Amino acid sequence: MYSTESRQLNRAARSSPRGAYFFSPCIARANPPYQEEVGDGGNKTYATPIYNKFIEGAYKLSDKVELIHPARFLFNAGSTPKQWNREMLSDPHLSVVFYEASSSRVFINTEIKGGVAVTYHDRTKDFGAIGTFTPYPELNAILRKVRPAMDGKALSSIAVNSYSYHFTDALHRDYPEVEGMLSKGHAYDLKSNVIEKIPQVFHKEKPGDGEDYIQIYGRVQNARVFMYIKSEYINNVVNLRKYKVFLPAASGNGGLGEELASPLVMGPGVGSTETFCSIGAFDTEAEAQNALKYIKGKFARALLSVLKVTQHITPEKFTYVPLQDFTPASDIDWSQPVAGIDRQLYAKYGLSDEEITFIETHVKEME
C-alpha cells in the first residue's frame, strides 16, 4: 500500500511524540508537536494543545496530508477549541486511517489521554464527514439504532457539571479573609481541596444556632466527607433541593466500558465540591435509585464510552446515552436487577445478538 519511502517516513514520524515533519510535492506527512511546554498561566497541571494549529497549517501547504496526533478531538474532548473539533468532524475530506487508545503502544512510555490517531486529509476526495467517531464497528451499529429512537432526549440534559456549585457574596461578607486563602481567581469556586483550605466555614456537625444549613460532599485527605455550611453561602443549583446521583468528575482512564467509581444517591440539601458531578433533579428517592441502576448498567456505560475517552466526566459525555423515564410510569421495570434492566434496554432499542454480545463482553460489570 505504501512505498518504501512512505514507510520510512511513517516510522520516522512515529519515533517521537515531540514532532517531526516531512514534505514532498505530493503529500505532507508529520508528527506535529502536541502542546506547549508551559501550561496556561504557568499552571503546570495544564498544557495548551497546539497540534490543531499545525494541522491547519499543514492543510494550507498541501492537498494531501497524513498526520499522527492526539485523538481526543475525534470525540470532541480535550482542550482544543470545540468549534475546531466540530469543523474537523464535519470535514468530508478527512478520514481516520489508524486509531490506538493506548498511546504507549505507539510512543513507548508516553501516556496521551484519549489515544493517538493517524488521519489523512485529501482536498481532492470526499470521504464523507466523520460525524461521530468510534473505533468499534459494533458500537457504531448500536449508535445508528439508538440515536433515532432518542428523539433528541439524552441523559446529558439532566446532568449537572462539577463546576455548578459556588460560594456567594454572603460568605465573603462574613469571612473576608477567605479570598486571600484561596487560589487567585477562584474565590467563589468549590475546588476539590476547599474544605481543607478554609475549614472555618465548614462544620462536621450541624450547628444548633437556628440557621439554615446544607451539606457539601467532598474529600478531605483522600476520604469522602459530608460537611455542613450555611445555605446562604452556596448558590442555588437546580438539584440542590432534589434527589440526585453523585459520581466522580474524574473516573478511570477513558477505556471502553470501564467501571464508574462509586456513584451514589444523595438527598435534598446536599451539594458538592468540584470533585463530583451529578445526574438528575428528582422529586423522589426511588427515581434517583432507578437512575443509579441505569448508570451502573452495561448499556448506558457502553454509550457513555462513545465520548468519554479520558478520565473526565462532564454532562456532554452523556450525549449518546438515552434519557429514560425513571418514574413508575416508565416502560422499563426498574424493580429488576441491573442485568435485567439491561436486557429490557437491549430489546427496547432493537439490538442484535451480536451487538448484545459486544456490550456484554466489552463492558465491565459494576457492583
Placement of each model-derived feature along the sequence:
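Short secondary-structure boundary/capping segments
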Residues: 81-84, 113-114, 366
